[in-house]
């Protein structure tokens, strides 16, 4: 039995890594999709601000995702625990801030650059662990991080001669800091017994609620909330974000990330810019 337990744990970890890689591919799709949606909506509402499009997109994207999940998992929600509510709220706080900054930043920078800068959490996470838990970053982790950053730089085709830190780049770096908090919250021992479906629903719905006041503050008119998606391309891009980049990617990440460390998760998520760069070619 003692030999079976480590084997079982290793198998579970390997399965978690595979599922996180799968989810990250769909998450990487969000970068070119959000970029394309930004261009589409600027044609529909040329006078609206990027913050309006960003906040409205978050409200619709996560609101629809949360409602769809609530319909399918209504029975589980009946006995939702206080810690599941708490974890969902914490994840929503970090998530909505990160997504708002990331989506607005995409209006001012390329999808591949946005995906590259978002990977800042693969550096932020081990630094946080080292500072808070007083655990030094091992040479193995250091070289893994260095190799990942170098590889992502090459694959995302980052040109440092023309690279600049403008509004889009700075917003994306701030988003990465918030995503760091989200990743760390998923592995917190306090939430180990939580059911991922329940706190994911809370997270999605609260992200929509948190973004709604920004929609109200930046909307040119009430009709603009409908006109922003009053075309087949805009509606189709929103559907892609809801189904693939939210329902599939987030629920898989929320379910499986606890079986790896936060540092490992951050390194796995670094394949995002590869997919984003490839998809941005089409």
Regions found by a protein language model. Name each.
Residues 69, 137-158, 176-179:
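Hydrophobic transmembrane alpha-helices of multi-pass small-molecule transport proteins
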Residues 1-56, 93, 101, 161-188, ...:
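Glycine-/small-residue-enriched transmembrane alpha-helix faces in small-molecule transporters
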Residues 24, 35, 66-69, 125-126, ...:
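Transmembrane alpha-helical segments that form core, pore/gating elements
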Residues 36, 40, 63-81, 150-163, ...:
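Membrane-interface helix-cap regions at the ends of transmembrane helices
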Residues 37, 57, 105, 110, ...:
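Hydrophobic/aromatic residues within transmembrane alpha-helices
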Residues 76-77, 102, 121-146, 274-282:
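C-terminal transmembrane-helix exit sites in multi-pass transporters
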Residues 2-9, 58, 62-63, 157-158, ...:
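C-terminal-most transmembrane helix of multi-pass membrane proteins
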Residues 21-33, 89-108, 154, 173-185, ...:
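Hydrophobic alpha-helical transmembrane segments of multi-pass membrane transport proteins
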